[in-house]
């Protein structure tokens, strides 16, 4: 199938042609896709011949519905695009934190050692996510390691979700506390070393994080 024909199928889905018929005109579709009405008609006929849509002509326009075969194609396309976009890679920009990372890493250090297998440097590297939209998009296919909460000196420390990562060859983890003040655009990274010093990072530097 040609890319333009596939784009037409996607456009029909966006217009609501899944689960029921919609009425369209060649003029509005051709304007959306920046092609002639004749080309739009030819693409509709191709989709119909391939079994991806059903269509009927009337005085009001063309009634179109995406078939089950067409829906399966769109679902497969969505899965492939999701894998391509959210393959566990985060591209971000180094930023300064609010200064609390060192304290909390020290409190959780014994549990980080137990559950992640390394002694963490007392501090976090904060990364503002550029791609994908949020850290959750990059982590959606990964299973977290749950570091359980605990009480210490009358204070309660909540659970932490940890995701193993590698940044410029150094293994570490993205940590997401159950009680976080950071928005989903900020990734907190811990590692056995001072990442800023080891990788010579400054605020504004771009980094690439691979989720393991």
UniProtKB/Swiss-Prot annotation:
Where on the tree of life does the source sit, at the highest rank? Answer: Archaea
According to its UniProt record, the EC number is 2.7.1.161
Q: Does the keyword rRNA-binding apply?
A: no
Region: Riboflavin kinase, residue numbers: 88-212
Q: Where is this region: H-T-H motif-like?
A: 1-87
Binding of Mg(2+): at which residues? 124, 126
Its GO biological process annotations read: FMN biosynthetic process; riboflavin biosynthetic process
Q: Check the UniProt entry and state the signal peptide residues, or none.
A: none
Q: Write down the required cofactor(s).
A: Mg(2+)
**What are the alphabetically sorted keywords of the record?**
Flavoprotein, FMN, Kinase, Magnesium, Metal-binding, Nucleotide-binding, Transferase
Binding-site residues for FMN, renumbered to this chain: 180, 188
Q: How is the cofactor bound?
A: Binds 1 Mg(2+) ion per subunit.
Coiled coil located at which positions?
A: none
GO molecular function annotations of the record: magnesium ion binding; nucleotide binding; riboflavin kinase activity
- Reported function: Catalyzes the CTP-dependent phosphorylation of riboflavin (vitamin B2) to form flavin mononucleotide (FMN).
Family membership: Belongs to the archaeal riboflavin kinase family.
What name does UniProt use for this protein? Riboflavin kinase
The species is: Pyrococcus horikoshii (strain ATCC 700860 / DSM 12428 / JCM 9974 / NBRC 100139 / OT-3)
> What gene is behind this protein?
ribK
């Amino acid at each position: 199938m040609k890319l333009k024909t596939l784009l037409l199928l996607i456009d029909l889905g966006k217009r609501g042609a899944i689960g029921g018929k919609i009425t369209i005109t060649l003029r509005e579709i051709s304007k959306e896709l920046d092609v002639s009405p004749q080309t739009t008609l030819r693409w509709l006929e191709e989709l119909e011949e391939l079994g991806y849509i059903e269509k009927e002509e009337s005085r009001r326009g063309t009634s179109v519905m995406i078939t089950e075969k067409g829906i399966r194609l769109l679902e497969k396309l969505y899965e492939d695009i999701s894998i391509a976009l959210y393959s566990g890679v985060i591209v971000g920009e180094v930023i300064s934190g609010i200064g609390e990372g060192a304290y909390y890493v020290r409190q959780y250090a014994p549990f980080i050692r137990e559950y992640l297998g390394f002694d963490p440097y007392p501090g976090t590297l904060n990364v503002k996510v550029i791609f994908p939209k949020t850290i959750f998009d990059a982590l959606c296919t990964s299973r977290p390691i749950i570091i359980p909460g605990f009480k210490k000196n009358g204070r309660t420390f909540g659970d932490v979700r940890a995701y193993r990562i590698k940044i410029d060859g150094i293994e570490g983890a993205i940590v997401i506390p159950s009680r976080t003040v950071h928005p989903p655009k900020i990734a907190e990274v811990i590692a056995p070393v001072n990442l800023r010093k080891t990788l010579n990072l400054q605020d504004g530097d771009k980094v690439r994080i691979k989720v393991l």
